[in-house]
């Protein structure tokens, strides 16, 4: 009979098989009430699953990450229960858990509206309020198929036919009259599923294949309690206000149009931000001793066959033909950088060789995945590749990490999650080579005092990598930076250097990206700052305004003085009330507004206001210029007097 060992090392002895819920009851009524599931010998199981032999057991509650995920998955089933009651002819496809919630793909003969979602959510609450038990039954494959065939659930039948072995015993979860199929676990009772919200719908092809039928995907979020739900909804509301697509339109930064899906039309102010960002990274390239190069926009398909991209990546590549030759528009810069390395004989004394490029790349992303600047088809990578010896890897990775944190810190990103992905099952190279490479990456992180998580088996087949994920002010994660070792591509493209013993040696290549995509990073910055860019990167840094026509000459003189100092400035001499001008430029998020009236003209001063509404008073013109230049040149995140 089972001896159950709990996480604190204590043991409970039973003379019959017990479930996690039974053990929770044995410990106390509070834990029994909170029990959602169990982890038996490391494996998640339903609260009612029987344990027949000695086992390690952890009781899972809503406070655990696994408990929250289980509850969210059960909310997807609750959605299925509700939609089948409201529209019985609906056919259910798949309903997984996603970050912060769940979705369900459904085949329904109506286009779901917001009113439908409200009705559906209301029915879900009515069902959850009944606090009914969820009954799990393990059945044969044939019984599961017969159950769903009788209910007209064609997609469930297809899943059984195509994805589940006939020897398996699928789990059927009964929500009163509604039945769903899942590996589980799920909540034992619907009392755990009360704090949810249906959010939106979108189209989704069955199996993700555009040849299949388009289904409707219903998204929802679910949380452990009302407070967490409301906090999340408030974050979403704030995120909507910060949406870079909305701000981009308000500030006239860029636009996109159907004739060029996923390609950015940069307007003057947006392109100013782009160029400032590029200039900053270019300065860092010089500081960290990189060459800056520029590779061709497209290259012959033969080269991409050599690299393996044609075999593994061709669906994501744009191609064109000329004079009976097929060309690929580059999706990445690395093959071009190897070609530059290959020009001329290289010695070990020439290494490390650091090569950076603002490379214009294109990838044929699915049209449904395109999202403003965050997911595009045409983008600019701040890409770099370092060619070095095996002995130089650790020092070079160390410098890459320093550069990554140097750049991110300038923009105020200090919450950075770091993951080290190690050798996958299918890989090239020897175990010794991989061990040394992984140790070099880990040591470089440790030497820089950076905590990190291992991602076992998640490295590329050609080398381990470090990933840097930024967390913004809304705690959203953005994976931007990468340091990737590559033992494969240089050799495949014939790269070598003359070693100390006059032998030919293939260099190690380090792929290094910091911003990732310039376009995406501008999108991230726009949402992080809500369009209130630090002065150094703001498209217009200062607007000088007159109150009446009598100050026009003074405004123009002051504007020229600021321009000559290298400050991006505009004069606003329109015949409008000063309050109107201030409101307009405040909405445009211009960092500083300089107001000139007769008093300022007489004193040779200027009244200074910030976009946050702070009145800095009347200041000497030279003092204003000096302070602005100091703020801009230091790339300060804060304005004067903040």
From Swiss-Prot:
Cross-referenced PROSITE patterns: AA_TRNA_LIGASE_II, TGS
Compartments, as annotated in UniProt: Cytoplasm
Presence of keyword tRNA-binding: yes
Coiled-coil intervals: none
Keywords per UniProt: Aminoacyl-tRNA synthetase, ATP-binding, Cytoplasm, Ligase, Metal-binding, Nucleotide-binding, Protein biosynthesis, RNA-binding, tRNA-binding, Zinc
Cofactor(s) this protein cannot do without: Zn(2+)
GO-annotated cellular components: cytosol
Annotated cofactor note: Binds 1 zinc ion per subunit.
Pfam family, one: TGS
Residues engaged in binding Zn(2+): 334, 385, 511
Annotated region (Catalytic), positions in chain: 243-534
Known EC number: 6.1.1.3
Subunit structure: Homodimer.
Family note: Belongs to the class-II aminoacyl-tRNA synthetase family.
Name listed for the protein in its UniProt record: Threonine--tRNA ligase
Source species of the chain: Serratia proteamaculans (strain 568)
